[in-house]
């Protein structure tokens, strides 16, 4: 017999769903007369990698802000998996108080476009801060975590933990932002334009790192779910995620990378205008010496 929720639980916005990490139901959001999100319905399953793409003003960032609870919808619901409950529960974010939201937030992390690192502070301090303030870990555990996650993003903990953020290259700063997110051992990892502003070779390295991080399970053995907000066509080619394309706040496409790539839609086709150059670079037709960029 399948589990049944009580009417009280249903009224609190709780629903059963064993494999779903995010469910968005009939989501609307307007700013003035501008409809930014216009009836979004989306389900993200545990372990998926999803890229949300679209032009400027399509609603990508607003959708991300709703998923992490920074914005409230005009209509509709955003439900996220509650990994601290018994069973497979999805909880409506709008029903949560601060304590309930904090409980959910322990299991996700966001890598922001601007990295959100504290300038003037060291790499080690930036990684330790959420471990100390949010998770309340002791200093010995924090020290071990710092070394572990810095190695995971291909930095040298003996050299790089003591560097200040203003001493880092763009690629190193992005690696530190990813390391800080990994330190929280997230089941859901969200990236907002993770390669914006990076040189092409460095962007390639960050894309490969994102793919590698996605393949690693959490400490509890759960598959990691990755959600990317991006306009980076190269990333789609390298990672081949499930693709959600937004246009004027609506989902224009939801499907595999291969279907997206071969679409004849006049809206989708421009995303592949630069693909031949990328293919040449990946196949080695560019001078290899030109690709030896520092990380």
Please provide the spans of the model-predicted regions:
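Helix-to-loop junction immediately C-terminal to a conserved catalytic motif
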Residues: 68
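ABC ATPase NBD Q-loop/coupling interface
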Residues: 77-103
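Conserved ABC ATPase "signature" region
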Residues: 140-159
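Conserved ABC ATPase signature
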Residues: 164-168, 172
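Conserved catalytic motifs of ABC-family nucleotide-binding domains
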Residues: 185
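Catalytic Walker B motif of ABC-type/P-loop ATPase nucleotide-binding domains
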Residues: 189-192
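Helical segment within the ABC ATPase nucleotide-binding domain
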Residues: 204-221
